[in-house]
Amino acid sequence: MKRLVCFMVAAAMLLSLAACAPTTQPNDPANTNAGNTNDPAQPGDTTVTPADGEVSGDYLVWNIGVESKSFDPQINTSSAGGNIIFNIYDGLVRDTVDGIEMATAESYEVSANAEGVENTVYTFKLRKDAKWSDGQSVTAKDFEYAWKRACSPELASTYAFLVNDYIKGAREYFSGTGSRDDVCVKALDDYTLQVELIQPTAYFLNLVSFFTYMPCREDVASTGEGWDKDPAKCISNGPFYLAEYKIGSHVLLKKNENYWNKDNVKLAGVKGLFITDATTSLQGYEAGEIQITGMLPGEEIPRLLAEDPNFTSEPSLGLVYIAYNMDANLVNDINVRKALSLAIDRKLICDQVLRNGAVPAAALVAPGFKLSTGESMRAMDEYGNVMTEYEINPNGAEVEKAREYLAAAGYPNGEGFPELDLLYYEKGSNSQIAEALQQMWKENLGINVKLKVEEFATYANTINSGNFTITIYDWGADYNDPMSMLSLFSATGMNDSRWRYKEYAGVPDDTTLNPENKPYDDAIIMASKTMGTERDGYLKEAEDVLMNNMVICPLYYTISTQVVDHSRVSGPGRTPIGMWDFRNFTMIGK
């Protein structure tokens, strides 16, 4: 998912973890419930602390670092929003470090469809004690509504492909060639949900654990835009619920007393801060005001690694890369794309700019993803380092080759090459990375690059409209399978590189077609239909097509760095895709 950062906020304001007003206004009818303590899990109840925004010692304070555009499970695309959703909603299952475990569902069965194709029909039995935060029962109809909502043409969700590519009838509904009733998700009764897949999918339960598949109540979503961030309207079914939201400041998540597993939830709640300045974030932690933050200054990483036992750094299933707009002039030439890619010293970026243990990348799929054999898709040396692939040397620039490709494109030594705009958004080390790329391309290729930075809301609109040439982009896995990365570039995937061989209803303005995408799509389709080593072959084939066409320019595989104050908090950490799961956290000490 996109790692999104929206707003930079004044350090002085953010350091004072002070009281702020809730989003409901004094004259808002929803505010009439603010003092109601009869139902301790009532949405809109902001009496959780002595003053709005203040928290007691039983609240964990966590710097989210980002203010997501949405907390709506079917609309959100960011890890920031995903972290909120994972803690206020409960899907049918959860993906944990120990594997898939039951959540709102207490059991499931897998069977054949009417044509006799095995492993295509999943039947989930829901817990009868699962409740929404307002006390209503969670039913199979809530999941049916949510999953059909995710693929509805009216919602036009960016993540519709996570449903369209797997559930029978969903793609047709989304494209307008079918109806809502054609989507093969059905509540057989209040506590039984049945879904039929297009073909067997080995990782379907991993998909179901993702936030796009979380439940949503029709009467809640139909209240209009903005319900997901309004504490008076946002009704959820997870271990916590949204008690308070202050733009530019924080969210308060309060323990949901109607949660089916509430007895094992030890926190009174979580305060999530929107501090995007890494120095301010670290200062808050070192002052004892923040227990968890991953927003850390790159220059401080060596010190933290050497001195702070609360600091951890571990590989994650993500990639930072340059996305080429395959329909844009200049970079629609593969020689230009290869020249730009080979002229980059990735090791220098990792060692001197990031300094956080990030791994130079030579392809799309991170080393942590495994094939059916347990092996990585990456070529690794005897020390576990990524090796050269697709002509990309992860340990240095291939300057001579890069210049040859640029000359083949008609720009020897960069002569006549137009000024190139490099777009990025405000986040962490993005500016330093952009400046390093600008310098490398000038020194190694003789071309001029103009840096263009936007705050995230503007950036998202720019990318969605296709109004860019190249951009620094990042993606973290939505589920623990190589397809989580590879499916992005299918004709019906998110595909912000706009590399499609056929038009797609989800991006109606992307009408410039790229025929070389078809063999990629063919391999993706076959990888979806097959299992084991046969599937492994198609996954590799798809990545080969993508990288041989240099649709993206890999920079580095992401690393998860954070500090967790173990003198104040105890907990198991993150899910396999890097989401914080606070259900089992406990505050210790004072």
Model feature map: region roles:
Residues 254, 332-439, 443, 541, ...:
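Append "and occasionally in soluble cytosolic enzymes with long acidic Gly/Pro-rich linkers
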